[in-house]
Amino acid sequence: MQKVLIADTTLRDGLQHEEHYMPLELRLELLNGLIASGVKKIEVGSFAHPVYLPQFRDINAFAMMLPRVEGVEYTFLALNRKAVERAVAMKAAGAPVDRVLTGQLATSESYARKNMNRTHEDLFEEARQMVRMLHNGGIERVCANVGTIFGCPIEGEMPLSLAYEFDDRLFDMGFDEIEHSDPDGAAAPDRMAEYCAEVMRRWPDPSRHVLHVHDINGMGMACYCAAMEQGIRQFECTLGGIGGQPANCMDGTIVKGTGDYYFTQGRTGLVSTEDFASMLGRMGYDTGIDSAALTRLGGRLEIMLGRKLDSFAVAAAGTGYENAKYDSAAV
C-alpha cells in the first residue's frame, strides 16, 4: 500500500484568514484532535509581528504548550529576519520548533512587489541568509515556498520554467524542502501533472517536496491526484478548506498594512483535510489517519467558527454547524 502524507495547516494558513481571534484553548483542542486523528505534520502558526498578524499575537505561549508526541512534526512560518530570530529563540527556549517555512518567493515579480514589497533578487538574498540562520539555530528542517507557479492575479498565466529555476536556486542554497504553492487556484490538473513530472525528474526524493494548493476554482483535489500520479507524496490541507491571505480586519479593527482582498470571500482556502483523507482512504492509500475522527473534528471547527465550511465529508456525516444549530448539546 502506497503512503501519502497529509500535512495540516489549519492552525496557520486557516486561521490567518479568519477575522476573529481564536483563543488558545480552542487551538489546543484542534491540535489535539489532529494528533488523535493521526495527522503527523502540523503547521501551528506564524512568528510574524502581531501588529500585522494579530491572530498569532500569542504564538510564543502557544509554542510552549505544544505536546511532544513521537512522530509528530510542528512547523512554524517565519518570513523575515525578525521572525527567523524569534523562531531560533523559541527553539533555544525549549519549544518544539521542528520545521520552519521561510524564503517565500513568487515567480511573478509583480505579485512579490505587491505582497512582500521585494524584488526577486531581494527575496533570494533574504532566503540565503535565513536558511543559514535557521540551520545554525538548530532547526532540523527548513522549507522554502515557491508560489504563483501557474499564474497570479496580476500577471496571469506564468511559465513553468521560472519555477524550475527557483527550485534549483533554493535547493542549492541548502533548503531541505520546497513547498510548491498555488495560492490563487490557477493550476489545472494537466499543468500540475506537467510541473510535478519535471520536479520529480530533477529532484526525485519525494520527502523534499510538498504541494500547497488553494481550492479557489474547485480543482484542488484533481490537482492533488494529478501530482500523486507523478510521485508527489506530501500535501497540505486545512480542515473545512479554510484559509487564504491574512485577514485585513481582526475583531472589528483594521489590521495595519493590509489592503483589499485579492478575491471575493466565496472561496479562498485550501483543499479540505477531511475530504482529501476520505478520498485517499477509498483509493487505497495509507495516510495513517482515522478519517471518521478527522471528519468529526472538521464538524467541531464549523461549530467553533459559527458557519458551514467547504467540507463534503462533514456535510455527509451531518456533524457540522448546520446540524448543530438544531442541537443545543452540540454547541
What are these regions (language model features)?
Residues 1-331:
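Catalytic cores and adjacent flexible loops of soluble metabolic enzymes
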